[in-house]
Amino acid sequence: MLSLGAQTAMAQVPAKAAACLACHGENGNSTMPNTPSLAGQNARYIYLQLRDFQEGRRDNAMMTPMTAGLSKADMQELAKYFSEQKLTNKRFATDPEKVKKGIAKANETLCAMCHQGEFKGQNEIPKVAGQNFDYVVKTLKDFKAKDRNNDAGNMTSVASTLSEEDIDNLAHYIASLN
C-alpha cells in the first residue's frame, strides 16, 4: 500500500514514466547501485540516451526493449519529466582522501571542459554530480573497455587513460557532489 505522499507523487508521473520508476526509483532517484538516477539530469541528454537505446547505438538488455515503443514525443516528455525532478539520493559514504585524489584527477583530465564545473553537465553532456557511486564506476569501466561507445569516442579516449584507482577516486568525488 502506497502512502498518501507516494500516491500523490505517482499521480503526477507521466504514464510512460511509471515503468521507469521500477529501476530508476521514485522521481528518478535510483536506489539500485548500477542504475543511474535520472532526477535532475539534462533533458537533452536523457532524450539522446533513450534514442540511442532505441536505435541501437547504446545496448542494454533492459533499456533497449523498454524504448522500442516510444515515440519522439514520449522520449521528450520523459526527458522533461526526469530533468525537472530533484536529485535526493545520497546514501554512499565517500572517503575524503579519495575525493581529494578524484578532484586532482578530474583537473588533470580536464573533465570540466565537457561536464562543466562540479560535473553539472550541459546539453548532451550528462550531469554526473551526485550520481550513484557504483554506476559511475561501471560507466567509466564500460568506456575504458569500449563496451560503451555512443559518445563519439570522447569518454572512451579519456577513460582509456584511467587506472582502477583513478576510477575509484573519480567516483568518490562525483558521488560527493550535489
Segments from the language model and where they lie:
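C-terminal capping alpha-helices of c-type cytochrome domains
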Residues: 68-90, 134, 160-178
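Gly/Gly-Pro-rich "capping" loops immediately C-terminal to redox-active cysteine motifs
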Residues: 28-58, 64-70, 107, 119-145, ...
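Hydrophobic alpha-helical segments typical of transmembrane helices
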Residues: 16, 45, 49, 62, ...
